[in-house]
Curated annotation (Swiss-Prot):
Family according to the record: Belongs to the eukaryotic ribosomal protein eL32 family.
GO biological process: translation
Protein name: Large ribosomal subunit protein eL32
Keyword terms, alphabetized: Ribonucleoprotein, Ribosomal protein
Organism annotation: Drosophila pseudoobscura pseudoobscura
Gene Ontology MF annotations: structural constituent of ribosome
Length: 134
């Protein structure tokens, strides 16, 4: 039986389009990743009509759904079995995510313990391989 979140609202983003860097469409050497314009005459910085929009605090997500996954859980990074037990009382709000640097031996232990504590993991199959027949 899978664990379901205690509270699962509809996640609404105020803006789904990415903020792109000024003149990144004009020059290939400029990446599309956002950089705040600092020039004294810059039209984007001065917020002229028809220019790219700048990110600001008003585009932030709802406080209740911020950092929430589409499943309705919030992520918690787990490096060992002991860190998994922090989620014991919060298993309907948080789900564990096994850290990148964890070995496959420790991953197996974490997955087993999570199943016992009924804690959901986002990546339970990561770097786990069943034995191949020879």
């Amino acid at each position: 039986m899978t664990i379901r979140p205690a509270y699962r609202p509809k996640i609404i983003k105020k803006r789904t389009k990415h903020f792109i860097r000024h003149q990144s469409d004009r020059y290939a050497k400029l990446s599309h990743k956002w950089r705040k314009p600092k020039g004294i005459d810059n039209r984007v910085r001065r917020r002229f009509k028809g220019q790219y929009l700048m990110p600001n605090i008003g585009y932030g997500s709802n406080k209740r759904t911020r950092h929430m996954l589409p499943t309705g859980f919030k992520k918690f990074l787990v490096h060992n079995v002991r860190e998994l037990e922090v989620l014991l009382m919060q298993n309907r709000v948080y789900c564990g995510e096994i850290a990148h640097a964890v070995s496959s031996k420790k991953r197996k232990e974490i997955v087993e313990r999570a199943k016992q504590l009924s804690i959901r993991l986002t990546n339970p199959n990561g770097r786990l391989r069943s034995q191949e027949n020879e």
